[in-house]
Amino acid sequence: HVLEVGVFFGSSLRMWQDFFPHAQIVGLDSFKGVQGYMCRPEDKWCNHGRTPGQRLTFDNPESFLQEWRSGHDASSALSRIQLVVGNQSDSADMERVVSELLPFSPFDIIIEDGSHLNGDQQRNLAQLLPILSPGGTYVIEDVHSSLELGYDDPPGSADTTLRVVEHFNQTGVLHSRHLSRAESHSLQRSMRSVECVVLGLDRPMYKQSGACFVTKKREKGGGGAAF
């Protein structure tokens, strides 16, 4: 079972369905597009009857799904894909989302690729790690937000996601202004290891990108996740 937080316009759903041909895939998003986002000529997800400069938003998950499968033979894959509506930045809404995700859990892989805000990355980890399989992998994508301006913490400061997990790897202690004490302690008990990779990019939008891979502890006497 695979969960992706932050579906954007669906290209990654198609990638996961191809990469994991037997997996059940759940996509979590508001499915409203990105506020103010305009299609660009290089945006492949805007090619379904859209033109550059046109705003791309969706009224509901059904309209998103219709757009997503437009021009593609996705009938066989649709039975493996479920969509859940939620706001990753709203802690109360995420409590509801976790309850809605329980029938699909535990997940073997969770990919968080939403707002890229440090606070959302860390709170979502605390909220969703309990429904990850023991030994499973939780991926925090686009951790360049820890290093660049324009996000919710100064670049490289102590509460950015990269610095928080670096401190955890060095000390076994996880502390951040974005997490409650209970959330921090719960993560410390559940996280076995974190490995991060950051790469330099030659792109106008991002100068660097990267991801952190969190491995959840295995239960005593239990097996790991099956990929």
For the regions a protein language model found, what residue spans apply to each?
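S-adenosylmethionine/decaboxylated-SAM
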Residues: 1-227
